[in-house]
């Protein structure tokens, strides 16, 4: 199949590219925002999306999932198919991106699945109700929008989660402010936070939970993984290993700091 580059009618910053049976969405070429395998549209092709599904290790049966940033809808489609009892709401600022939902085989709205056009930060500030999982994957042609990475935004994310709720944030690893954003999330969630590198190294996925004990220990994670792997073949074992590895590093760092003091 020949390559196809198709800018949307209203903006030159949103670009579709089709090649080798894959359809990709770009906000700032050549950076890929989303990628879909046309013969298997619900498959999570990009590794950062598979890492983000690690929220299942912390919240295996979410009743309500809210996602900020739709993109090509990879996570939205996967959650709708594999978590049919969960309500899923995606909030996307760009109507041009939403207009591409048919190209990316994003299902129509229904009782448990909705795509809303609006500002994600404003949506959470309003009467949005509480969620069990918040997925933050909002980017534009400039990168991370300021409204989706401020201290006030992360504080509001904490407030909008049920007890035990999980925040998952996709960050660009090469963003000079990445460490600052992680610090803001740690502050909002009282240090109940761990950062896992996506396999390609281009993304850092932050998991934070509104709970007293975090993260789960080895035995608990192993048991959850055993139950989840029969349904979710999305490298949850790698994400679990990343969580445990980063938590060990954090604890060692604390011990070293105390010893120096």
PLM regions: where:
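A short, flexible beta-alpha/helix-coil linker loop
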Residues: 30-34, 139-142, 167
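The AdoMet/dcAdoMet-binding core of the Class I SAM-like
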Residues: 5-8, 19, 23, 43-159, ...
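Short histidine-centered beta-strand/loop micro-motifs
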Residues: 34-37, 125-126, 197
